[in-house]
């Protein structure tokens, strides 16, 4: 089962100093438990659901920032910032890592900085600067005074994206912020900001226009009054590639701490820098000789395809920016994704730049050579060079963090679970169920929901089934050996897990008059859906809906063009990312003939006869509905054939509100049901429970939300799920586990069986005993790894049967439970906590006393205490009430797929 989840304004290049009224920092202090408002029963109930993070971390995710305290020697402490996974810290040189960003409102990081004069002071700028099609928005800048343990939001919330944070070398209260502003729209809160009071107030000291922000900012290490700032005109529109060049882009310098600025790319200066059609600029100032400044400059001379030629390159100044010379025409492509340059602190001629490869120059940028990056992921974004040892390097790329201690000849990967999942499914035909999902630039991976190992679930338990940018994946319910998976722009393969035979089944030209190749318009993420009614049929979304039969060997097109491509929204300048494509597909679990599609430009179609005829129902939404946004998810109801749920994701239109709808009549009318969701976290996916039709889940840009009343009210689910985008959800039918994929912190799992059993009256009852999920009996497999402390290990769920009950009031003596055989023989006594709310007790599938030995049977005490598979009953007695539930104990299944546990 798989569920998914404006015209440009004229530019004014003249910089304007426009300090606005002082902006106050949002302290966001948390009340202590003694003063907090009392929690209602439902809040306590929902907070009791704790998620397990399964990773994986074999490949991590995009790392955008590195920050290492200046200690005067080798630093064992450093921080990394992830595109979607928050801030992580190591205090032992990278052996182990700890997430320190749970106090942040979002987990997308643009830059990090540690105060040189006080290494406890750490700043985090939220909102990635790389302007990727799948990036998320920030909510300003945060400050920690205790090395990342606690954070305070210091304002600038509407900047949405931070390019650089620069801290004064001797005064930690003086901080500069290079803010890019909104990626998907125009806004005035962008530019260079300065605080002199530690972030309590801010002044905007440099501003160009409401489409131009600042992507880089560098300080002269010998004079903190001298700074260089790189302005970047950028704007994405809808689903397209961005417009990344414009009159606002340029290079600026101040010599008085931001009071006045000089535009170094002014054509009148004739100083050797390019001055027209500028794009992204990266900057670096030499530590040993601060008069030496490098700039990587993107220049577009009218080329409309960003993957083709660009004119610009690496420029160097030896006089503090007065004059420049082009030393190399090297430019990383595409420029919206890379453009930073780094200088060896001990040698201004030793320069590194990032691109799909890590490039090194030893002659001042005249020539670059790719570093030896064997067995290292590509696409680089951050680099730190040890001032005391230039052989010691740390890099951040799309695969995570790597450390080298020999100048880049060999690298060590840091295991940090910051994977950026687009989709997730569960394969319930295997027991325990398997989880598969596609990750940004890290392929498609599958792994177990639990193992027999006492250690837990390791990265070795996961296995890749595809490469590239991992997208959608499907496994037929009746064939766990076949995996269909896709990668960017419509590519599709079929993998046989028994033989590892892979077949490319991407649809090519259908008509004799068409050229071979890809005649359809594929989106970046192409949806794939295996029919619930016929496992040999797949559906694939392009600008048409494509039906694939015979396991993908044949295909035909169902219906018309299901996008606005032929009607409106012409692709804007520099349109690289494909647009006008089906983004979500749904099939009714109750009828194979009812199919839905939703496109990335807002169209919704439905058929009730298997695709013979279609109705476009986009105009049926209530007035004010954002019907030109991405249709992120359509979920057909498990309970009513004519019912469906729909989510619009509008952040690509600079709209960050939730947009969730329901239809009861195949799209003829729709009602909005997302009004109780947070107003600034968007909406990404919706999921209807197959047991309880009033139970819905929604994924937002900062977590998962649940409604128990069909959408009238919403609550956040769980306490420990990070504030991270939830793009997809799936449910294990046997275990009643909700599997959540996040775009930045990997996969998370929680059991939602008690939620499915919720009723209006349950919370008013003094006590309730919930149904118990099947439990597995097995001998734990002891593992004795000697690989050290570094590898990531995810916890298994508790071994045994998890018994869940609800108490309305405190029971000082706790709760007594008894386990019996189906025949009524008592075999185990248990005691559970008596606190109000939802409580859990795990029966470890053993008896109170070992059973008698039998001839030829087991002899160890552990084996004699262990119960056999079969039916058992748990009974809870309290205050003259007695409740009982069945427990199904199953043997651990035979290993049907040899590589799985």
Per-region residue spans from a language model:
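Sec-dependent N-terminal signal peptides
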Residues: 1-11
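Beta-propeller blade termini and top-face loops
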Residues: 12-791, 798-801, 806, 810
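Glycine/proline-rich low-complexity spacer/linker segments in large multi-domain proteins
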Residues: 240, 247, 855-870, 893-895
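Beta-strand-rich binding/interaction modules
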Residues: 493-495, 803-804, 811-824, 828-829, ...
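Residue-level recognition of well-ordered beta-strand positions that form the cores
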Residues: 529, 804-806, 818, 844, ...
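Glycine-centered tight-turn motifs at strand-turn-strand junctions
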Residues: 627, 826-866
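Intrinsic-disorder/low-complexity, polar/charged segments enriched in Ser/Thr/Lys/Arg/Asp/Glu/Gln
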Residues: 798-804, 838-840, 882-884
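C-terminal tail/sorting-segment detector
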Residues: 878-901
